[in-house]
């Protein structure tokens, strides 16, 4: 097993044992009623929420390569349909960036 995976699993054990997840508790319904489709670029992991002032529970965040909708019956459309029709989303944002990678 990769050393990075081992470290993540060890951290997760401590995280669960000490109930550190409690501070992230929220419902499945996005408080701001927004869904965001964005790129899965690792540089965006913390940058996008920080740049938009969003936190856990605020929005439904959907990420894929390039932040694209590539098929009319694909997982991105399915996720957006669930967000709108089941979770109360009324606004969808598609957010891209330069130098995707």
Residue ranges and their predicted role:
Residues 1-70:
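Short, conserved "active-site rim" segments that organize catalytic pockets and cofactor/ligand binding
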């Amino acid at each position: 097993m990769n050393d990075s995976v081992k470290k993540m699993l060890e951290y997760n054990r401590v995280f669960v044992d000490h109930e550190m997840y409690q501070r992230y508790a929220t419902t499945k319904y996005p408080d701001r009623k927004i869904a965001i489709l964005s790129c899965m670029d690792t540089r965006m992991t913390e940058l996008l929420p920080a740049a938009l002032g969003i936190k856990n529970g605020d929005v439904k965040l959907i990420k894929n390569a390039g932040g694209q909708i590539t098929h009319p019956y694909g997982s991105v459309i399915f996720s957006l349909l669930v967000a709108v029709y089941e979770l109360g989303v009324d606004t969808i944002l598609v957010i891209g960036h330069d130098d995707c990678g």
